[in-house]
């Protein structure tokens, strides 16, 4: 299986993608080389969601983080990990010779996050970066769905996981574990509840049936402000070199 191809789908993943709809739009344009000391943040959306869908949590978080100096943030569809790799390499390639050398590798910290199938793509992407000897400061999985989305590769410094475990069919991957505990620290796994307030009060009106059928908890998590507030803190901490979660009570 190539990194671009979806793996054999489990029932859980199949329901996640069932009748997803929505045509893919052209992806982001290539970035300029970013300044040294920057934080490059890559987000992956779930299902068949468009890379630029402003109503999805992954994209909303990216647009919020873009307002902060020193953070360079872009989002991609979960099927476009190779496109995201090209984006990162272009951002690091200061001399524009088409290669990322050892000095350029250290120009920026890299943070990767994703929701649903985007959580699966987060680890697929981290493994691609490992193949290029590119370190990852943080991987953040949000209600991750997919195959082989629990093993965090050893080029990742910190890993975090936000999930719900009450969905009728879809429950986020947990626990995650480092391939090499000497190199990767799982800073935390946080479970969110949707069988009582405030979780079960989150409105999912207006979503198509395939986004809510047997997966209401999964849909609510994407709209849960607690989730994205936590995600924002974790990303900011990692970009600033702090242990993610250290800036606020867990």
Describe the role of every protein-language-model region.
Residues 1-10:
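Bacterial N-terminal signal peptides that target proteins for export
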Residues 31-108, 213:
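Active-site catalytic motif of lipid deacylating hydrolases and related acyltransferases
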Residues 37, 50-58, 77, 81, ...:
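Solvent-exposed, acidic/flexible segments
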Residues 89-179:
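Serine-dependent carboxylesterase/thioesterase catalytic core
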Residues 160-250:
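C-terminal catalytic-base region of ester-bond hydrolases, centering on the histidine
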């Amino acid at each position: 299986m190539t990194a671009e191809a979806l793996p054999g789908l489990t029932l859980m993943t199949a329901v996640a993608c069932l009748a997803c709809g929505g045509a893919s739009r052209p992806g982001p344009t290539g970035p300029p080389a970013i300044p040294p000391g920057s934080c490059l943040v890559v987000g992956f959306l779930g299902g068949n969601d468009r890379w630029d869908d402003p109503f999805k949590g992954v994209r909303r978080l990216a647009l919020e983080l873009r307002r902060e100096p020193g953070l360079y943030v872009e989002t991609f569809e979960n099927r476009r990990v190779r496109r995201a790799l090209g984006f990162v390499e272009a951002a690091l390639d200061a001399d524009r010779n088409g290669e990322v050398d050892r000095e350029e590798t250290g120009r920026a910290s890299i943070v990767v996050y994703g929701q649903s199938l985007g959580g699966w793509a987060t680890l697929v992407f981290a493994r691609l970066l490992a193949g290029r000897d590119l370190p990852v400061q943080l991987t953040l999985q949000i209600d991750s769905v997919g195959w082989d989305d629990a093993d965090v590769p050893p080029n990742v410094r910190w890993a975090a996981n936000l999930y719900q475990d009450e969905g009728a069919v879809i429950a986020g991957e947990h626990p995650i574990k480092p391939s090499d505990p000497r190199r990767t620290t799982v800073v935390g796994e946080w479970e969110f509840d949707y069988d009582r307030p405030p979780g079960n009060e989150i409105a999912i009106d207006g979503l198509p049936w395939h986004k809510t059928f047997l997966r209401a908890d999964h849909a609510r998590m994407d709209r849960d402000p607690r989730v994205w507030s936590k995600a924002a803190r974790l990303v900011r901490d990692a970009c600033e070199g702090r242990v993610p979660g250290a800036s606020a009570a867990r």
